């Protein structure tokens, strides 16, 4: 008689303390994290090589930490202190890899049934049919993976994992290879499924759009450590670390020195060095606790900068900076303009703005930057 699966708790929480050091001959890398993931989406966000996949591998059991503890709703999967290490097959943790690894000789329905051999056939078919409906691929049940689209194959992979009724779900960049429209539809399906089932879902991505669309909570990783966490708005809107700022879409990041503090009006004046003798750009930023002479980093999103071809007046924005247009580069339906104003800044424009302003390299322009578009970060 097959061993019954552990009963899934009504509202599980995943807690993990993981310490893993790889030898230099392997990765020369260490993972050191401590986090809690409640039922729902927790997005693991960070640059390549930051340890996102290694974290998932440790939770799944594919990689064994040297120290730490991993538990879901109190059920301990790993505990180095007493040598507990539940095998992968008994953890009841679903894992969808970047490589979908569907069986090409099996139909969509057969692929989805693969992990249910212990169930009677009628029960298998009923459970699979429900998942295929949830992910809108029930009409493809008799087709093979080579006969469906990339987005449909991804839905099959999700159904195959979820049909086993896991206590937690690990998703390693599952939508990376898909176009934006297909990605959006699958995200909608995942969100709808999650609303009904509410298990901890760790979702690895490089995409800021996916963080915003899916993330109830986001953990940002760098060099095997969690460097920021919170809601997407908390983490991405005003980042405190340069790595987070880059991931959050702050294209302009500069070294600066606090020159003046204006406590009466809640601002600082910062100096950005230009690389020229005695040259600098002045930038008014929000007030923080910093003494004149302190070194800071300033981040500005390219989409938060206005560009004018005549010097504007009568504005609430505190920063109006003259410069010269260096280049214009079309990126899909957007223009990336680079402007030299002592430091080089990137500005994002619409195609219509470029045409209306008759912009060409070499033209004199002015950049308009609001004080609260300037974010100060740790150095």
Each model region followed by its residue ranges:
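Short coil-to-helix segment of the ABC ATPase nucleotide-binding domain corresponding to the Q-loop/switch region
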Residues: 106-113
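ABC ATPase NBD coupling module
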Residues: 77-94, 118-121, 125-126, 239
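A short, proline-enriched helix->beta-strand linker immediately N-terminal to the Walker B motif
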Residues: 163-167
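Internal alpha/beta loop-helix hairpins
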Residues: 195, 205-275
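Glycine/charge-rich catalytic "coupling/switch" loops of P-loop NTPases
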Residues: 276-329, 348-379
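Conserved ABC ATPase "signature" region
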Residues: 75-80, 123-140, 191-192
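Conserved ABC ATPase signature
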Residues: 144-148, 152
